[in-house]
Amino acid sequence: MSEFIKKRIRELVDLINYHDYKYYVEDNPEISDYEYDMLYRELVELEKQYPEYIFPDSPTQRVGGKVKEGFKEVVHRVPLLSLSNVFSEGELYDFDRRLRELLGTDDFNYVVEYKIDGLSVALEYENGLFVRGATRGDGNVGEDVTENLKTIRSIPLKLKDDINIVVRGEVFMPKDEFIKLNQEREENEEPLFANPRNAAAGSLRQLDPRITAQRKLDIFVFNVQWCEKELKTHDEALRYLKYLGFKVSPDYVVCSNIKEAYEAIKKVEEKRGLLPFEIDGAVVKLNQLALRDVAGSTAKSPRWAVAYKFPPEKKETKLIDIEVNVGRTGILTPTAVLEPVRISGSVVSRATLHNMDYIRQKDIRIGDTVVVQKAAEIIPEVVEVVFSKRTGNERIFEMPKKCPVCGADVIKFEDEVAYRCTGVECPAKSYRLILHFVSRDAMDIAGMGEMIVKNLFERGLIKTPADIYDLKFDDLVNLERFGVKSTNNLLKAIEASKKRPLDRLIFALGIRHIGQKAAKTLAEHISSIDDLFTITEEELLKLPDFGEKMAKSVVTFFRQDQTKHLIERLKKAGVNTVAEKKAKSDILKGYTFVLTGALSKYSRSQAKEILESLGARVSESVSKKTTAVIVGEDPGSKLTKAQELNVKILYEQDFERLISAKSHEEVEKILME
């Protein structure tokens, strides 16, 4: 039986790795997502039951569960040198002349490749298994990012040959993933990445591999650094790398001489804007590997290769108008409407103006002649005004005082750049608000994930959080992948959410600057949500840890007619809007706990809520003042910190005894054991 199980696990590993290669490397999937998911699920279940049969190249081993304290240093077996740059045809011909003089022969050719704008890494394989991956660093010493690199699905964990080899590649973020990531960061009010290269570097150097896995990075392998197998040309090496299972630099061209190489470079430049990934030039490499040894290297760069860098393409055009778009968090963003102009291979008719401060600093006006370029070759932006072409008929732009989508007030805090719509029912931001409303820390509607919300939203069945409570059986049962059982479960979850405490509802409303802690503070100082419609900024500033921004945000939010309408609908649906009289008990008052890892019976937010309802304080960090750390499965660095500080460690069974304690003496006894 055990041999049969082991054989089946091996079959699944090989099969899934094959389909990963077809999907992520060749972009030619042979099975549906559903079929793939079923294979993967079978493998996960078998590995759970038989962990002794987990193979190192199993696709389940790509994402580790532990957060690192830092990255170890790795000394590269072969230095990862940087390339010297040229910027013109003349400089390219000078490179060719120097190389011919150095080699004393014309009997060689070149390979021209894309210069991918990403992060350079070395991948090391022993007997065909991926054992180590490191960043370039200073060329001699890099950082060990093996676990993070395993999350990149186009990196094979096992090669077709059992060979020892070190290869070099460029990790990058595809353009569409970069745009998606920045949209998500904007919605979460996190700093945006300036370009795909920064996004790739920041993603690869995450201490938590799970974050890296979410970022959808990719890689092109472009060089054999060291290999047991004898290879004669770079062209042969690339073909061998592809055979082994690597995703190699695409569309490379073998050129007979430098003239052909320059022609290939110009073709690359013509299509750079149409590529799904970012490039900042082309690389010209000597093809014959033996001659590379003759040419040698300087301390920083090889003499046998050069990077031809492309300048950012800029064009003049007319700014016809400025439109205002409203994002999912309510931020108003000005967009330039342009006379169409071709830049980097595509026609541009709209460009970002970033924000109102940017418009003022650049003195951009409607009717101006402006210079447009593609930021990081992706997002068109207005970079400057051609003041010499001003006629006097240009118009100064002002941000609207009312939301162009829903008509609610637009506000701007003094120390912020952004202008925001305050409307709680604004269609432009309601999708994101609904996702927040149903989330675990808010109304905790189990089973109402992003796909369900998106489906309901696109069908027009929900437009505001209140619409959730109007959903009927017939609305849900016909949704994709929904049946009678899942429909009934979701309706039960929606019904259960009506009984959530008031602080959960306040947090669920998505009020700017009001997190869980502030929502709890508000709920503790009012009798019902109705009190917030008349509360003043002065009264709010008297509350613990309430600042001016928070106070202004609450008052502005609850003065909107849309808010009043939403609360009335929630009340009518039976959602609790009244504060609890008092905490269940103060038996844990004076104690501070930290949670780490996953408890089997309680979510993190549920455990926190229970502890706080008993008077305890729950902290995010461990210190000498921490009473105890409650540890679940797969704990993080907090456990290590607790052990270093000699802080009491409690497990799930201790937690359950603690919250069931009837007296302070019983609590002390548990903590002293």
UniProtKB/Swiss-Prot annotation:
It is an enzyme of class 6 (ligase). Zn(2+) binds at residues 403, 406, 421, 426. Its cofactor is Mg(2+); Mn(2+). It comes from the Bacteria. Residues 583-672 form the BRCT domain. Its EC number is 6.5.1.2. GO terms for cellular component: cytosol. It catalyses: NAD(+) + (deoxyribonucleotide)n-3'-hydroxyl + 5'-phospho-(deoxyribonucleotide)m = (deoxyribonucleotide)n+m + AMP + beta-nicotinamide D-nucleotide. GO terms for biological process: DNA repair; DNA replication. The active site is at 115 (n6-amp-lysine intermediate). Keywords: DNA damage, DNA repair, DNA replication, Ligase, Magnesium, Manganese, Metal-binding, NAD, Zinc. InterPro entries: BRCT_dom, BRCT_dom_sf, DisA/LigA_HHH, DNA_ligase, DNA_ligase_AS, DNA_ligase_CS, DNAligase_adenylation, DNAligase_N. It holds the Pfam family BRCT. GO terms for molecular function: DNA binding; DNA ligase (NAD+) activity; metal ion binding. NAD(+) binds at residues 33-37, 82-83, 113, 136, 170, 285, 309. HAMAP family: DNA_ligase_A. Belongs to the NAD-dependent DNA ligase family. LigA subfamily. DNA ligase that catalyzes the formation of phosphodiester linkages between 5'-phosphoryl and 3'-hydroxyl groups in double-stranded DNA using NAD as a coenzyme and as the energy source for the reaction. It is essential for DNA replication and repair of damaged DNA. This is DNA ligase. The gene is ligA.
